[in-house]
Every structure is written in C-alpha cells, then in structure tokens.
Amino acid sequence: VLLVIDTNVLLSGLLWRGPPHALLGKARDGAVDLALSAVLIEELLEVIARPKFADILARTSRTPKRILDELRVFVDVVAAPPLPRPICRDPDDDAVLACALAARADLIVSGDDDLRALGMFEGIPIVSAAEALIRLG
C-alpha cells in the first residue's frame, strides 16, 4: 500500500505519538510505502523550522536536516508536476493531491478539513491517520 501523507500529519508523526506516528512506524518497517514530492519536503522543512517547534526539536536533539535524513531512509521522492487546474483553496493542498496522483498512491492521509471534505481524488481515498491505520489493519 502506497501512502501520501500531508505535511501536518507527517510533522505530527515525526514529533509526537499517536496515529500519525504509528503510520510512520509502518513505513519505517516496510509494511507500507510512503511517497513525498520535493514540494512537500520543502514545505515540511519550512514548517519545522518555525520558532514554535524549536523547543521540541531541542528536547529530542533533532534538527530539520536530521529529520530529513531520517525520512530519506524510508520515503520515495516522486516528481509531481502541478495539477492542471486548482482543486483546493490552498495551493499546499493541491501539492498533496499532485504528489498522490504522480505516485499512484492508494491512500492520501490528511488532517486538513478541505482535503478531507473531498473524500476522494482521482479514485484515491482521502482519510485521517486513524482511518488509514484501520484500513491497513
């Protein structure tokens, strides 16, 4: 099963426990495949460098570069051309959809209300991290 995980779920899984963390564990263990695009990785690095994450990074002795190095071990980076037309209000959400389409993902995992409201994109279900875990068994 190939997943594309949005930046907020990815960040949550990297920094805290819970369903997003469990999904990343499945990817680390090879139970699922995880794909990201360069645009999504860039967004992750931009978000994680924000001052509000400095404390948790310091407490866990991690840097944005170290997190990226950790991800490179179990994430496939795909070339994801932009969508031909906008789907969502937020261009960052369209980047998730473009990545899923390019990767031929089986599931899009997101906590974003706009993405989740779509329910499905080009035949790819859009689900929460908890729902993804249920589907994966």
Question: Residue ranges of each PLM-predicted region?
Answer:
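Short, well-structured N-terminal submotif of metal-dependent ribonuclease cores
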Residues: 1-36
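Short, flexible loop segments at the rims of nucleotide/cofactor-binding pockets, characterized by
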Residues: 11-13, 57, 83-89
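PIN-domain endoribonuclease scaffold, especially VapC-family toxins
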Residues: 28-83
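Acidic, PIN/NYN-like endoribonuclease modules and their adjacent C-terminal/linker elements
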Residues: 101-109, 113-137
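Residues at secondary-structure transition points
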Residues: 18, 35, 58, 62, ...
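A secondary-structure boundary/capping signal
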Residues: 6-7, 36-37, 111-112, 129
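Active-site neighborhoods of divalent-metal-dependent phosphate/nucleic-acid chemistry enzymes
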Residues: 73-107
